[in-house]
């Protein structure tokens, strides 16, 4: 709605898709004929910054108002509803017709009558348009992938930017404005081998965790690789490119970040490439490349004996629930999805990032499930989720099960959490640890000091179960053991690292550190990146010689050693079992 956008084609247009696929295939055939022996794969780019999300996703304007969008929208409605009567019933509008349906107005898309969530009772058209936009972007990516696959005769890798399901939690207009919540559709394509993104632009600086934008472990479960674009601003970077605020000013700090990033990729089975985003020689220092060479000590044994990354902690996101987030809902999803990767990274144990449907399909096996957006589940999905996570600890974030299909339901929330829930009116979403919470190690208050709607409390939590309280005294964080395992309800948006540590201890998760530290681990390999000055008490869980892989020196015997570390320092270690 911000006027013509000549830079981007309309992905809903069958003409664009046809022509783009044909021309892409022609380019690939030409390159294969002339230079095929030198090419390992193809990485088509398009839309905003080449990353296949709608133009101006991070800004105020709304996409979707081109003529081709409207034609595609009406075709999609016809496929979804079959006839006008079905559409009229769904939209509760006796005057609407598939052939004349209009794109929801900017005012309708910016409205938020239900607060955080779109209300299906009055916003069905807006919800449908959000789903339409996800499918159009995902299907365009898949069609172009097929063109590359066929033109290369199946001999080359096919790569795309897509699936930033954690990163777009910060979008004010709602995450779905991006078009990236069709990740499952893209993962189902046999024509895509690698998905990628930059390292998150949140928490990527010195002392930070450099988190993934996506449900990276679900990408691996789909038998695809996640590729990090490491555009870390080295000490040689100039200008204000994305992430400029986190730039460093020395080669020593640069190398600590680069080693952290490569180490994380190694233990999580990611790929990575160093990207000179400014095109001015960011990596033009042999000392950086010497560090990359030293990282062979971690890469080579993992290549020789690959190990699946199956962490005890799973951070889980549901695409459908994110599509339901309204304009302004980032008051919840920014702290609760985008920023939550900071405390997850610091809690002292490695974590994986997954889609909810992988959990319900029993493809994920964790001791602790952090269910960040399990907000919109029908009865079958709730039963499958409880069955798949039976015996584990579940962290239920913000509004678990609030929508039973299309209807708000406190009973559905109770079924999931085991707590009788109550909806609060005009309460700020801020949680202060109680005396019981402090006994378990909680020190940090968290949430937002502004009112959000809806907001929930555990109405029947006892004082012994209440770990943190809202300003009105009601239970904001509550822990209870039931027949399905431990249930931790967290009402305010966001989490704290000390809360996650307490939950991990309850769940039987192995903690490598008992204080904040960025930890990445897989099998005998551990990468630490210090988030603060001071000694790190490391517990590798088994006896054996602990070795610094970058120097080759033995530094102690496990399972427990103390490492003096400075803020931003990275250590790459292995344990040789005795």
Role assignments for model-derived ranges:
Residues 254-255, 372-578:
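A conserved amphipathic helix/loop scaffold
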Residues 52-53, 205-207, 236-238, 282-285, ...:
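Extracytoplasmic/secreted cell-surface and envelope-processing proteins
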Residues 180-186, 343-363:
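A short, well-structured beta->alpha microelement
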Residues 159-339, 424-456, 467-471, 475-479, ...:
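Hydrophobic targeting/anchoring helices
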Residues 363-369:
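Short acidic/histidine-rich motifs immediately flanking catalytic phosphotransfer sites
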Residues 154-156, 222-224, 389-394:
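A short helix->loop->beta-strand "cap" motif at the edges of active sites that frequently abuts
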Residues 1-194, 198-201, 208-209:
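Polysaccharide-binding and catalytic clefts of secreted carbohydrate-active enzymes
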């Amino acid at each position: 709605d911000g006027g013509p956008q000549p830079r981007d084609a309309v992905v809903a247009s069958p003409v664009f898709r046809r022509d783009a696929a044909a021309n892409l295939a022609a380019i690939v055939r030409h390159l294969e004929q002339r230079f095929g022996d030198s090419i390992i794969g193809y990485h088509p780019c398009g839309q905003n910054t080449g990353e296949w999300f709608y133009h101006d996703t991070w800004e105020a304007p709304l996409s979707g108002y081109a003529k081709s969008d409207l034609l595609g929208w009406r075709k999609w409605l016809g496929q979804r509803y079959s006839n006008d009567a079905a559409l009229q019933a769904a939209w509760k509008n006796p005057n609407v017709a598939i052939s004349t349906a209009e794109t929801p107005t900017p005012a309708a898309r910016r409205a938020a009558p239900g607060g955080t969530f779109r209300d299906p009772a009055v916003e069905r058209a807006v919800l449908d348009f959000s789903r339409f936009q996800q499918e159009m972007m995902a299907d365009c990516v898949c069609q172009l992938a097929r063109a590359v696959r066929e033109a290369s005769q199946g001999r080359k890798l096919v790569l795309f930017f897509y699936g930033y399901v954690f990163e777009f939690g910060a979008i004010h207009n709602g995450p779905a404005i991006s078009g990236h919540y069709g990740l499952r559709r893209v993962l189902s394509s046999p024509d895509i081998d690698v998905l990628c993104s930059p390292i998150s632009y949140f928490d990527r600086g010195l002392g930070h965790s450099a988190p993934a934008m996506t449900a990276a472990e679900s990408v691996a479960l789909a038998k695809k690789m996640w590729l990090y674009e490491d555009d870390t601003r080295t000490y040689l970077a100039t200008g204000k490119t994305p992430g400029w605020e986190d730039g460093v000013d020395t080669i020593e700090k640069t190398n600590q970040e680069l080693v952290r990033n490569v180490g994380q990729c190694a233990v999580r089975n990611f790929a990575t490439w160093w990207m000179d985003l400014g095109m001015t020689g960011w990596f033009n220092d042999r000392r950086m490349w010497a560090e990359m060479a030293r990282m062979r000590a971690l890469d080579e044994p993992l290549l020789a004996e690959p190990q699946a990354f199956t962490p005890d902690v799973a951070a889980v996101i549901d695409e459908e629930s994110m599509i339901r987030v309204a304009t302004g809902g980032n008051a919840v999803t920014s702290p609760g999805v985008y920023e939550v990767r900071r405390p997850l990274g610091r809690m002292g144990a490695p974590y994986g990032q997954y889609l909810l449907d992988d959990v319900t399909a029993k493809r994920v096996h964790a001791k602790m499930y952090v269910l960040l957006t399990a907000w919109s589940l029908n009865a079958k999905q709730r039963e499958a989720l409880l069955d798949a996570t039976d015996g584990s600890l579940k962290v239920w974030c913000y509004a678990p099960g609030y929508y039973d299909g299309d209807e708000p339901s406190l009973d559905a929330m109770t079924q999931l959490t085991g707590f009788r829930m109550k909806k609060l009116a005009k309460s700020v979403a801020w949680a202060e640890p109680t005396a019981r919470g402090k006994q378990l190690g909680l020190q940090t208050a968290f949430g937002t000091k502004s009112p959000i709607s809806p907001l929930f409390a555990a109405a029947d939590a006892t004082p012994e179960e209440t770990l943190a309280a809202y300003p009105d005294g009601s239970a904001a964080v509550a822990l209870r053991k039931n027949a399905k395992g431990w249930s931790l309800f967290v009402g305010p948006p966001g989490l704290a690292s000390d809360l996650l540590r307490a939950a991990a201890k309850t769940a039987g998760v192995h903690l490598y550190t008992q204080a904040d530290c960025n930890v990445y681990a897989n099998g005998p390999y551990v990468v630490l990146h210090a988030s603060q000055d001071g000694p790190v008490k490391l517990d590798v869980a088994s006896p054996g010689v602990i070795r610094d892989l970058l120097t080759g020196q033995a530094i102690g015997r496990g399972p427990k050693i103390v490492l003096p570390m400075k803020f931003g320092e990275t250590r790459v270690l292995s344990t040789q079992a005795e």
